[in-house]
Amino acid sequence: SGILQQRHFEMIETDGATLRVVVEGEGPLVILLHGWPQCWYLWRHQIDPLVAAGYRVAVPDQRGYGGSSCPPEVSDYDIRKLTADVDAIRAALGYDTFQLIGHDWGCLVAWNTALLYEHTCTAVMGLSVPFWRISEAAVNPPGLDDRFWYIRYFQQPDVVERELDRDIERSLRTNFYGLGSDSPPGTWMTQLEHPASVGLLDALPAPGELGAWTTKEDLAYYVEQFSRHGFRGPTNWYRNLPSINALTPELEGKLISQPAAFAAGADDDVLLYDPDWRAPFEAGFRDLRFLEILDGAAHWLQVEKPAETTALMLRFLSEVA
């Protein structure tokens, strides 16, 4: 239903990019940020319920993705530019403030937007990726040695794009399956059993069937979106991970003061990256409304458990209204 239903897209100019943004509904502004490798379509089950609940919903393809522009330089995707894009959507739509919900890489952008734009971003919710001040350990975890780790692999220029652009459908299915609820929990982490010399598609298991959460039509739409620019723009996001701290020294030790919430699937392998992931929420968020773990979901909770995820989003938005 998500594809066949005609969405209202607007093209929004930001500093250095043109974003294609689904904009629907009337009311307070809520911006939804996808991550890697995704596009606006990740939120296909959430848009209508949020509109029905009385919100204006803006869902961009973030820069480098889908119908948005794909700037050429690695530095075009640094954290300052990614967060500025979000506030530029607010300004273009004529709002003073907005509420923000991110998923995966969209969480890193959301947490940092909340810190850098605290006067316009009034509430922030993350799905899947906890609040982390990214350090070199994200790229080179201690003890990694010569084992494969996707974030380190993604730092290599051209190699990654060549591998993933060769067969876009296979690349997407491998990622969706490896992090999804159809593969056993921990599947994503099996990449660490492979040597650093292989590519991502060799380090992850061949994808099995995807459940009803990603139909053949869904997959075809994703392939169409990624065929526009390939994986260069999306992978450039990862090439900016090492620079986040240097570009935001004023955020060192700063935690989120706005109302905030976090939810993740119980089987999301991202939570295995850091057994201590709850600590920043418990230690430093000034107004954490809730932290929920959804059974039966892995990484793609918006589509694996759409009704439950939407309910958590609406619960948060209604609490902070």
Listing of model-derived features with the role each one plays in the protein:
Residues S1-I12, E319-A321:
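Basic/polar N-terminal segments that are highly enriched at the extreme N-terminus
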Residues T14-V23:
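A short loop-to-beta-strand scaffold at the N-terminal edge of the catalytic core in hydrolase folds
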Residues I3-H8, T18, L29, Y65-I101, ...:
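Flexible "cap/lid" subdomain of the alpha/beta-hydrolase fold that forms the substrate-access gate
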Residues Q46, T113, L312-F316:
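Hydrophobic residues on the short alpha-helix immediately C-terminal to a glycine-rich phosphate/catalytic loop
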Residues L288-A321:
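Catalytic active-site module of serine/aspartate enzymes centered on a nucleophile-bearing elbow/loop
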Residues F9-M11, V57-V59, F290-I293:
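Conserved beta-strand scaffold positions in the cores of enzyme catalytic domains, especially
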Residues V22-S69, F281:
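Conserved HGGG/HGGXW glycine-rich cap/lid loop of the alpha/beta-hydrolase fold
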Residues W36, W40-W43, W105, W111, ...:
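Signature tryptophan residues that serve as conserved aromatic anchors
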